[in-house]
Amino acid sequence: PPSADGIVWEQLWEDFDEIYADTDAYPFIETVNAGVYDEDNFIRFYLLLNTTISGEEAAEYATEVIKGFNDLIWEQNHDYARSTEDSYGGYVSRYNIYVMVGPDDVKDNRETWILEDTIPAGEYRPVSPGGEEETSAES
């Protein structure tokens, strides 16, 4: 049954995993995990790899995953806007976004992570390999 926000979470997590942990589409991915944490207003994404990819590839994949997560919610509840080129979409934009991309086999060692980024609620910028420091240089 749908939750108070009109979302069948069990279905959403199944679809999310089926799409973004598909090794035919994304041969580098080992597992995708995400969680919505209302208590501190975060959605956290943990994208674990079976091989090394570049920071740019990791950032593009992470941006795609975040938008895709929102759009899976949009498919269930059109009250939330779909993602666009310059928005993560209506559901995700209400939350701070945390994302990390790193190798699964050494995920506990933060130094091995390819990317770690936090994007404040309501703000849009693509995920960046250098986190928020890198984006201010672009103008």
Segments predicted by a language model, with ranges:
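Generic detector of well-ordered alpha-helical segments enriched in charged/polar residues
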Residues: 10-17, 59, 63
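Sec/Tat-exported extracytoplasmic proteins
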Residues: 16, 20-27, 36, 65-73, ...
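Mature extracytoplasmic domains of secretory-pathway proteins
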Residues: 43-95
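Short edge beta-strands and adjacent turn/loop segments
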Residues: 20-52
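Polar/charged, Gly/Pro-rich intrinsically disordered segments
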Residues: 22, 78-139
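N-terminal presequence-like segments and adjacent domain-start helices
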Residues: 1-13
